[in-house]
Amino acid sequence: RILDAPMHGGQHAPPMRTAAYVYTGWHAIAERDAAFHPGFTEWELVRGCRPRFAGHHQPRIPALGEYDDRDPVAVARRVRLAHEHGVDALVFGVFWCRGKRVFEAGLDRGFLGSEVGDTMPFACMWANRMPRRVLPVRRQDLPVLDPAREVPSDEADFVEFVAMLADNYFCRPNYVTIEGRNYLSIFDSTFFVRELGVDGARAAIGAARRWLAAHGHRDLHLAAIEPNAETLPLAAAVGFDSVTHYVL
């Protein structure tokens, strides 16, 4: 399986694999309809880009044109092109806020419903920063979320999130693993640790691992994305297995 190889250096190190992040926000959702106008998508932002200096070529429209990422035919065509040009796996941003999801149709319908959905390796990244103008979210026992888009969590919520991933994605044969463990990254790892505290984050990650074991799932390989200088030295102690970047 792609990326399922020992993590070590030297002459026996596995060949490098290239995984591309995928933002699944290229379709309309009710929250954006209400915040902007019916049918709004971020293609409007792409079309609206203008040059800001000499040699700045804007707008940049994809060679295949705009598409709805819920369309499995359109998605399959683009995934095949990506694979043919050196992309070995896809890492989909999963938006989750205490049980609320947005833009899941791009992954569930567009990718997994396509002809390549059961063969192209893929993994998930917890996008614990909701897209603009899809907040606030209210649950009976919780306050309205801060519109700054940060996604608070706790141990029970993190276990529920990982359980959702396990039931829907980890169980698939083309899900990316590292040394036999399901790869999962957290977009704002610094906020996650700050929100729960070091002990709380460690407890949440440990509880999620125990839930996976109790329900017959593989363990996690949990990657912290761009932890800040304060969080980085704590990553291993908190329970992260690796550190990576989102934008270099």
Predicted regions and their residues:
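Glycan-processing catalytic domains of CAZymes
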Residues: 1-248
